[in-house]
Regions:
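N-terminal beta1-alpha1 ligand-phosphate binding loop
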Residues: 2-30
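Glycine-rich phosphate/pyrophosphate-binding loop and the adjoining helix
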Residues: 141-205
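Helix-loop-strand module that forms the ligand-binding subsite of alpha/beta enzymes
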Residues: 57-147
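Generic secondary-structure signature for well-ordered alpha-helical cores
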Residues: 25-32, 77, 101-105, 133-140, ...
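Cysteine-cluster motifs in flexible loop/terminal segments that predominantly coordinate metals
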Residues: 42-72, 199-205
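A short beta-strand-loop structural module common to alpha/beta enzyme folds
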Residues: 32-42
Length: 205
């Protein structure tokens, strides 16, 4: 069983990393393998709606998105962490997630998702809601904890002082581990839920 964690901060070892690393420790204690990928300062462009991924099975731009895609397919759970910029996620991370979720043809049903956000002060819940949209449109159950998954601090040292925030991360990791293991047992016993043929409609005809 494996969890992929994406650090969407340009700072490799900052506040977002502090939150994700706290989760990593609990995952490992629970027997769950982890891999942490840092977006860092990689120049990741947004989707240009070319449709090339529908023919190729991968994004036409060969960058970190296509490196992460097979890791995403192989994992049982995905944790996405972001700093808060203007009550929103880091734009580089959003570009990565837009292309990652749209270009990958594999079924994401019942992979467990969780989002983690860090800020000096405000904008956390708006960013948290934004990131969860990627999971809820993809048939991915969303793991929750004892509070919204956030940590406060202006740097990693301050984030380490947010004792409640760190506890939230540990609780989230325990709940996510339980949910992934429960889903695995369910898949072994019952299989995945039946899917109807997809129906698409537009508001304007």
């Amino acid at each position: 069983m494996k969890v992929l964690l994406i650090n969407g901060s340009p700072h490799e070892k900052g506040c977002t990393y502090t939150a994700l690393h706290e989760m990593e420790k609990v995952f490992r204690e629970s027997g769950v393998e982890t891999e942490l990928v840092s977006v860092g300062t990689n120049p990741i462009r947004g989707c240009i709606a070319c449709g090339g991924c529908r023919k190729k099975g991968a994004c036409v731009f060969s960058d970190l998105v296509n490196e992460i895609a097979p890791k995403f397919e192989a994992c049982d759970g995905l944790v996405v962490g972001s700093p808060v910029y203007y009550a929103s996620a880091n734009a580089t991370l959003v570009a990565l997630l837009d292309r990652l979720f749209y270009s990958t043809p594999f079924d994401k049903t019942m992979k467990v998702g969780a989002s983690v956000v860090s800020a000096r002060r405000g904008g956390l819940s708006a960013t948290f809601d934004e990131l969860n949209k990627y999971f809820t449109i993809s048939g991915m159950p969303v793991a929750s904890g004892q509070y919204w998954n956030s940590i406060h601090g202006n740097n990693a040292d301050e984030a380490q002082q947010d004792l409640e925030g760190l506890q939230i991360m540990r609780t989230l990791a325990r709940n996510m581990s339980f949910l992934m293991k429960s889903i695995q047992l369910g898949k072994e016993s019952f299989g995945l839920p039946e899917k109807e043929p997809r129906v698409g409609t537009n508001f304007i005809r």
